[in-house]
Structures are given as C-alpha cells and as structure tokens.
UniProtKB/Swiss-Prot annotation:
This is Sodium/potassium/calcium exchanger 3. Residues 44-106, 173-181, 231-234, 508-512, 573-582, 639-645 are extracellular. GO terms for molecular function: calcium, potassium:sodium antiporter activity; symporter activity. Belongs to the Ca(2+):cation antiporter (CaCA) (TC 2.A.19) family. SLC24A subfamily. It is a multi-pass membrane protein. One of its GO terms (biological process) is intracellular calcium ion homeostasis. The lineage of its organism: Eukaryota, Metazoa, Chordata, Craniata, Vertebrata. It comes from Mus musculus. Keywords: Antiport, Calcium, Calcium transport, Cell membrane, Glycoprotein, Ion transport, Membrane, Phosphoprotein, Potassium, Potassium transport, Repeat, Signal, Sodium, Sodium transport, Symport, Transmembrane, Transmembrane helix, Transport. One of its GO terms (cellular component) is cell periphery. Residues 128-151, 203-209, 256-486, 534-551, 604-617 are cytoplasmic.
Length: 645
C-alpha cells in the first residue's frame, strides 16, 4: 500500500482539479437544458393529435405509475382515471413550489435550473471529500481485498447519486425518473466519456483487450437481463432479486480476476501485454522473474501534443530505483486488478512521479539528465535492448563513466532527500489549504475567492455536520462521516430530483427524458472530467474500463436494489410497473451502444484516438435524439401527454 501521505496528496489534487472544472460542467448542463427547452415545443404541437389517437383500448394505461403494485381499482378511482387522457405529473409528490407555473414560464424556472446545478456540485463535493474517504476507512477496517472493495464500496461511492435518484424515483416520485437517469448515465459513461477522452487526451492510447472485454461481456449480460425483465412493463420480486444476485456473481468474478485473466491470456496467447494493451514491448533479460519496474517503463508508440508532459514516457527513458510503495503502485495498475483500483492507483502514481521529476535538480526544461544506476548485467543501450558491447553502459557510456556517475548520484541522492523532506513539510503546511473549502478561511486570489464565496453555503453546512475523516483527529469518526454524508447525499438527491421535476413540468418534458438527459449528465460529468485527466497522462485504458465497469453497479444495484426492497420488504409479492413504454427502446439502444463501442474499438485496432472519439460522441447525439423523439411519440405512441394544472 502507498504511504498515507501520497494517498492524501493524490486525493487532494484530484478534488481540486474537479473543482476547477466546475465552469465547464455547468456550461454543459446549461446547453442540455437549452436543448430540452427547444424540443419541448415539439411535444406541445403533438398533444392535440395524441388526444385523438387515444382510443378506448388505451384507457387502461391512464394514470399508471412506476409503483402501482396491483391492478385492482375502486370504482371511484376507475371513474376518475377513465375521465383523464393524460399522465399525472410527479410534481404533485413533492412539496408545493413557491412559484406558480405561470411565474416559472415567465422566467422563474431559471432559479430552479441554478439550484439543480448547485445540487450537482454539492453531490460531487460530498461524495469526493467525505463519502468515498469514509468508505476507504471501512474497507481498511474490514480488511477487504482491493478487488472486492473496488467492486462494492468504491463502486457505491462513485455511483451514489444515481442510486439515491433511483430510490427517490421508486419510493417518492413513483415515476420513471430513476430508471431514465441510470439508463442515460450508462450511455453517457460509455459513449461520451470514451469520446471526450479520445478527442482531448492529446495522444493515441492503446487499450487492453482483457479489461474491455471482461466488463463489456458482463455489462451486456446485465443489460440483456434488464430488457427481458422490463419487456412486459412490470418487474416482479424474483426479477429484481436476480439483478442483485448477478452483482454478487460479479463480485466473485472480480475476486478471482487474476486467475480468469491468466486463462484468458493462455487462450489468446496475449501474455506479456501488461500495460495499455501494448504488443510491441521491449524484451528484458530474466523475463521470467516478476519485476515491478517493468510496469510503465516501456516506451509507448503514440503521438502527443507538446503541451502535455508525458510522465510515463519520461519514466521509460529514465527509470530510477523504486521504493516499496512505488513498486506497489505500479503492480496495482496492471490488468490483474479491477478498473476502479487501477484508475485510483494510476492517479496516485502519476502525481507522485510528476512531482518527483519536477523537483529533481537535474530535470530542467522538459529534458531529464538524471544518471541511471543500472547493473552492468542488465545494461540497456538507447533504451531499446541489451547492449552488445561489454564495456559500455547506458547510452554508450563506459564503465568508468558509470562509476563516476554513481558517485555523483550518491551526492545528488542526499541532496534530493533533503529536498524531498522540505517538500513533505511544505505539503503538510498546505494540507489545510487543499481539500474542501472551510467557511472561515477565505483563500487568496480573486478566482479562488469567487469559488469560495460560491461554495460558502455548502461549506458552512458540511463543516458543522460532517466530520472530515481525512484529518488525523477525525479519523476515528469515519462511521459518523459515512452516516452523515449518506444523509446529505439523500437530501441533495431529493432536492436535485425535485428541481428537475419542476423544470420538466414547466417545459412540458416527461420525467424519463429529464432523467436520460439532464440528470444523467449532471451525475456523470464529474466522472468524465476525472477520466479525461487520467487519459491525458496516457492511462486511457483505465478510464475506458472504469466507465464501463461502473455501469454494472448502476444497472444491477441502482435498479435492482430499490425494486427488491419494494417487492420483497415493503410490499411482498407486489410488482413494479413502468410508466413509459419508450424505456424499452432506450435500453435497447443502450445494448446497441455496447456492441458498437467494442466493435469500433476492435476496428480501430484497440486504439483510442480522435477518430474513435468523434464516432462515440456522434453516437451519443444519435441516442439522445432518438430517445427524446421516442418519448415525444414521434415514431409511435408510447406516452400519454402530461396532465396540466
């Protein structure tokens, strides 16, 4: 395990980077809201035609909701429903808004949009700074392996907003907003994250076939099971239980991932492809031994922009002696570990190595002149293969030169150790500055002050209600952090769904469309930005695998767990009814997106580049357009119009 100081430093830098990307996230959400508002006029034009198309044979659909648990209606309810040819909005399940519908149409809905965006930001802060650290402490106390922890607690931490949105959709709104959010988030994670990483990574990244195929195959099985269960527009108790059991099987697969991977390599003869699926690795003496320095020390063949500092390329050309923690980090980014673990370990390793290279006295202007201390037996010439000259060292230097460089290196190491100690002291002094903002300590700088003022209400509330278990004096209170952060995630998710429901009702947009577009983007954009940061450092393989692997939790637990609680615990023997028949088409597109993505990666020779990125973003646009038009009854009748005031 890496030192606690390295873990804290990596987490703080990741959280600060995600806060810096807040503006781009809000702009993206605003553009999605504008698109939905422009498309709402299409629904208003078709409402009159739909009223004529609704016949007597469709009156049984009137007033259906997601949580209708039986088909028995009283005569009074039947008469009330038969008199309506519209769907009751989920807005009535929430407290009354202070603005009327007319006020919102005149411009007050902008306040609800801003409030929803603020809830997106609040969820990201609570999950990153409080909820996930508390889950890490729980995993440490339970002595869980990295595989099981990544597939259970860490997956719950990254998908907490989607899970709570689904719970609210089942037990409160009794609509399709939860299902739409998870379906839209799943497509966003597959197509949009891969597309953004391919366009803006600044390089061509090779992808590992094992991780992509493993997660894609099981994810495909999950989506197929979901399609089969919702095809008849209702979900029974045993169907929801099957979804939960499938996730338990996924945990077992991750537990024995290394053994399964070895069998896969033996069958495909792909042994030796350890990092990013690279097939053209340099040969190394004594390859039978497991050497942690092999990982990420082979130079990749990719194109990059000059503005991107490639840490792994510098390490390939100028390796150094690894400490125990550094060797552990490099082992844990191999394909023997789950995507969640690999993504986390890669982020920590990249930050540590880049900081080391920047702080090195010999590292100037992007060119490293660090002397490499390598035994003569394993001398490498030009970094490509074993040297044929017995009296030559690294890059053609003689043994005498190596001895002299070794003496100089010893002196440099002593100086570097002193510099590292000073750097550690500086990092300890900056501990309070990084991480979540504190309400009583405004930062310096105009931009930071604006961010601090923007987040002050959130920081004030969290400062007094959620202990920060990252700090040593609050570390023992990690269970309190877990409980309080869970409550805040539930509260923020409730506010988020409430605001989005009001926005959809005001613009005449169904709840399922708001879930597929606005809620899905709001809960997934932070993960997209984090994956982009990792992909720009050459770790696109882990970003892609993480985006697909996290969807397994969303489908099997995000939907299966709330359904199982309702049909087994709350009302045993009941079933879940789906309000929108268009969801089956959206889930079908979700399944198609998996096949198209894997097939596109295969045709692109398992490389992530701009061409693949553009294709994925185009497919995501097609999915949004098709889903929106389907829910608006453009192709066929799937939804009754929403009831007015």
């Amino acid at each position: 395990m890496p030192p606690p100081g390295d873990q804290d430093c990596a987490r703080r830098r990741s959280r600060r980077r995600r806060r810096d990307l807040l503006l781009s996230q809000l702009c993206f959400l605003a553009s999605v809201a504008l698109l939905l508002w422009s498309l709402s006029s299409l629904r208003e034009q078709k409402e009159l035609d739909l009223m004529d198309l609704i016949g007597e044979d469709r009156k049984w659909m009137v007033g259906r909701k997601l949580m209708q648990v039986n088909d028995t209606l009283t005569s009074e309810d039947a008469g009330l429903q038969s008199s309506k040819n519209c769907t009751e909005p989920a807005l009535h399940e929430f407290p009354r808004d202070i603005f009327s519908n007319e006020d919102r149409r005149q411009g007050a809905v902008v306040l609800h949009v801003l409030c929803a965006m603020y809830m997106f930001y609040a969820l990201a802060i609570v999950c990153d700074d409080f909820f996930v650290p508390s889950l890490e402490k729980i995993c440490e106390r339970l002595h869980l392996s990295e595989d099981v922890a990544g597939a259970t607690f860490m997956a719950a931490g990254s998908s907490a907003p989607e899970l709570f949105t689904s719970v609210i959709g089942v037990f409160i709104t009794k609509g399709d907003v939860g299902v739409g959010t998870i379906v839209g988030s799943a497509v966003f994670n597959i197509l949009c994250i891969i597309g953004v990483c391919g366009l803006f990574a600044g390089q061509v990244v090779a992808l590992s076939s094992w991780c992509l195929l493993r997660d894609s195959i099981y994810y495909t099985l999950s989506v197929v099971a979901l399609i089969v269960f919702i095809y008849d527009e209702k979900v029974s108790w045993w169907e929801s239980l099957v979804l939960v059991l499938m996730y338990l099987i996924y945990i077992v697969i991750m537990k024995y991932n290394a053994c399964i991977h070895q069998c896969f390599e033996r069958r495909t003869k792909g042994a030796g492809n350890m990092v990013n699926g690279l097939a053209n690795n340099a040969e190394i003496d004594d390859s039978s031994n497991c050497d942690a320095t092999v990982v990420l020390l082979k130079k990749a063949n990719f194109h990059r922009k000059a503005s991107v500092i490639m840490v792994d390329e510098l390490l390939s050309a100028y390796p150094h002696q690894l400490s125990f923690s550094e060797a552990g980090l490099r082992i844990m980014i191999t394909s023997h570990f789950p995507p969640k673990t690999r993504l986390s370990m890669a982020s920590r390793m990249l930050i540590n190595e880049r900081q080391r290279l920047i702080n090195s006295r010999a590292y100037t202007n992007g060119e490293s002149e660090v002397a490499i201390k390598i035994p003569i037996k394993h001398t490498v010439e030009n970094g490509t293969g074993p040297s044929s000259a017995p009296d030559r060292g690294v890059n053609g230097t003689r043994r005498d030169d190596i001895v002299a460089e070794t003496d100089n290196e010893t002196e440099n190491e002593n100086e570097d150790n002193e510099n590292n100690e000073n750097d550690e002291e500086e990092e300890e002094d900056e501990d309070d500055d990084e991480g979540p903002y504190t309400p009583f300590d405004p930062p310096s700088g105009k931009l930071e002050t604006v961010k601090w003022a923007f987040t002050w209400p959130l920081s004030f509330v969290l400062y007094f209600t959620v202990p920060n278990c990252n700090k040593p004096h609050w570390e023992k209170w990690f269970m309190v952090t877990f409980a309080s952060s869970t409550l805040w995630i539930a509260a923020f998710s409730y506010m988020m769904v409430w605001m989005v429901t009001i926005i959809g009702y005001t613009l005449g947009i169904p709840d399922v469309i708001m879930g597929i577009t606005f809620l899905a983007a709001g809960t997934s954009v932070p993960d997209c930005m984090a994956s982009l940061i990792v992909a720009r450092q050459g770790m696109g393989d882990m970003a892609v695998s993480n985006s697909i692997g996290s969807n397994v939790f969303d489908i099997l637990i995000g939907l299966g767990l709330p359904w199982a609680l309702q049909t087994l615990a709350v009302d045993y023997g009941s079933y879940i009814r789906l309000n929108s028949r268009g969801l089956i088409y959206s889930v079908g597109l979700l399944l198609a997106s998996v096949f198209v993505t894997v097939f596109g990666v295969h045709l692109n020779k398992w490389q992530l580049d701009k061409k693949l990125g553009c294709g994925c973003l185009f497919l995501y646009g097609v999915f949004l357009c098709f889903s929106i038009m389907t829910e608006f009854n453009v192709f066929t009748f799937v939804n009754l119009p929403m009831c007015g005031d």
